């Protein structure tokens, strides 16, 4: 690969001297979007949770456990692995923000579990995540690139995880939300999706910047690698989806959602879509549930979700409004 000038010593970061304005733009977006799971009233979903069948509850817990694994990988390995490849100190700072928020996402699922589920059911779900071959396989695939020595391939794997691999799981809370179930949980997932949209966009952008520094042969090799990796991940994801959703008859809908987001991941990397439009016609109710207050899904420019609350509710007094 061509020579890329990496940071070779530590200097005090100066946000008044930004080499790439995208770093400052994304930093501001991520910090402006900051949220914590404790501020989302998931307990309001307890009555709704009680209307689900035993299998639906098990499926939902398994979906969230799978998402927890991906967030754990991205927070402790994936985003961190990108830091040594950063071209600017501000890029390093954005990756540390991404890593932290991935850990917040992983924590969020535990908040959902502790609110809605018994300890025994939680333990069963995590045991399932350790034993499910397709879930473990996708973890192994991305981890081998995170631990490799090719920076641009790391960014491809990271973008595919952020913009594609999460979505077999994100489908289910949007499905429940479209049926007026687990709506507060869905609000939390929308906050996660909003973050992941920025993460995938930014890492894909940095990939494109790095790709432009390579010669034509290397660029073609990386493009071929990207599509090969996507095919490998997609085939595994289809099996994972079948395992989760076959019994409730949602598999084909979820696969359309997967293909739709696979195309988005490729776009983040600067490549053309792989799947034709008739294979990505996602259920409109799901797209609407993704962003109920906007015409565009993945609207990460909006504020916190509609259920997001700050602090506990208290009675106000006249002097509270004297600013």
Regions found by a protein language model. Give the residues of each.
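Non-heme di-metal
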Residues: 1-323
């Amino acid at each position: 690969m061509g020579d890329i000038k990496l940071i070779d010593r530590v200097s005090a970061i100066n946000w008044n001297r930004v080499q790439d304005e995208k770093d400052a733009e994304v930093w501001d977006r991520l910090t402006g979007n900051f949220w914590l799971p404790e501020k989302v009233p998931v307990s309001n979903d307890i009555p709704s949770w009680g209307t689900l069948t035993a299998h639906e509850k098990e499926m939902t817990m398994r979906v969230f456990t799978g998402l927890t694994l991906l967030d754990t990988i991205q927070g402790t390995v994936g985003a961190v692995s990108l830091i040594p490849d950063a071209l600017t100190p501000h890029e390093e700072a954005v990756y540390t923000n991404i890593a932290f928020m991935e850990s917040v996402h992983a924590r969020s699922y535990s908040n959902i579990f502790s609110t809605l589920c018994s300890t025994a059911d939680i333990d069963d779900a995590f045991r399932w995540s350790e034993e499910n071959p397709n879930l473990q396989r996708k973890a192994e695939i991305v981890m081998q690139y995170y631990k490799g020595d090719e920076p641009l391939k790391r960014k491809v794997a990271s973008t595919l995880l952020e913009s594609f691999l999460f979505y077999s799981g994100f489908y289910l809370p949007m499905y429940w939300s479209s049926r007026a179930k687990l709506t507060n949980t869905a609000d939390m997932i929308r906050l996660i999706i909003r973050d992941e949209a920025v993460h995938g966009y930014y890492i894909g952008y940095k990939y494109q910047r790095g790709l432009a520094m390579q010669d034509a042969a290397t660029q073609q090799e990386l493009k071929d690698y990207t599509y090969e990796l996507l095919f490998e991940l997609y085939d595994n994801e289809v099996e994972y989806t079948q395992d989760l959703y076959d019994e409730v008859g949602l598999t084909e809908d979820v696969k359309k959602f997967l293909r739709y987001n696979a195309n988005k991941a490729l776009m983040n990397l600067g490549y053309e879509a792989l799947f034709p439009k008739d294979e990505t016609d996602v259920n409109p109710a799901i797209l609407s549930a993704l962003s109920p207050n906007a015409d565009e899904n993945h609207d990460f420019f909006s504020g916190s979700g509609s259920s997001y609350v700050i602090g506990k509710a208290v009675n106000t007094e006249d002097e509270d409004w004297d600013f």
